[in-house]
């Protein structure tokens, strides 16, 4: 009886140790993935800055933000000429910085890509407005802006639409949030201007994410 108890105790101790190891591996993997994403955002920001285009990044959220005054005239959904120039620069930088973390159209990553198991799951192009105006108008404006930005990004680099995730699904998609996700309180004009923006959100998956699980 005591022998069986000892065996059972050892069995549960082994399961607990295995679960703890898997949990530690998952935390380490997620932390490393966040660092990789932060580096990608930093490289995107640097590429834009070299062309005189100032953008903001939020590494914790995986977001690069382009303000309205870079891309659009106030209240308009069509890209301004300056906006088209900025998007063209962004498109080239996106391809250069994402191709190593996706599956290219021909299935072959560039030879100079680093050895990595990190990958891009999706890239969301998000439109945002301030709180001025009606909800319907803001929803429509944010969606149209994100769609127009998406179209010009794809047109600026024909290789971008061919980038896919591990499941061979297209990585780019759009979203419009209207006033629902302000970056700052909509209390003063300066903050409202900051809220009128397009965000590029990178969603990454860690290496072997599907294999990190606790044994039942």
Regions flagged by a language model, labelled:
Residues 36, 58-97, 130-139:
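Short, solvent-exposed beta-strand/turn patches at coil↔beta or beta↔helix junctions
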Residues 1-35:
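Short terminal targeting/anchoring segments
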């Amino acid at each position: 009886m005591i022998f069986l108890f000892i065996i059972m105790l050892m069995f549960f101790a082994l399961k607990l140790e295995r679960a703890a190891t898997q949990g530690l591996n998952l935390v380490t993997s997620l932390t490393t993935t966040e660092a990789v994403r932060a580096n990608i955002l930093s490289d995107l920001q640097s590429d834009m800055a070299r062309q005189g285009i100032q953008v903001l990044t939020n590494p914790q959220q995986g977001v690069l933000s382009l303000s309205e005054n870079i891309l659009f005239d106030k209240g308009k959904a069509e890209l301004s000429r300056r906006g088209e120039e900025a998007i063209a620069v962004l498109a080239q930088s996106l391809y250069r910085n994402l191709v190593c973390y996706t599956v290219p159209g021909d299935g072959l990553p560039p030879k100079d890509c680093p050895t990595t198991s990190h990958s891009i799951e999706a890239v969301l192009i998000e439109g945002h407005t301030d709180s001025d105006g009606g909800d319907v108008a803001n929803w429509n404006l944010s969606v149209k802006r994100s769609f127009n930005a998406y179209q010009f990004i794809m047109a600026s680099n024909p290789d971008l639409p061919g980038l896919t995730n591990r499941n061979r699904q297209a990585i780019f998609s759009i979203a419009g949030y209207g006033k629902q996700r302000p970056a700052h309180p909509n209390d003063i004009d300066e903050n409202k201007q900051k809220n009128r923006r397009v965000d590029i959100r990178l969603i990454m998956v860690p290496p072997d994410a599907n294999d990190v699980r606790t044994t039942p």
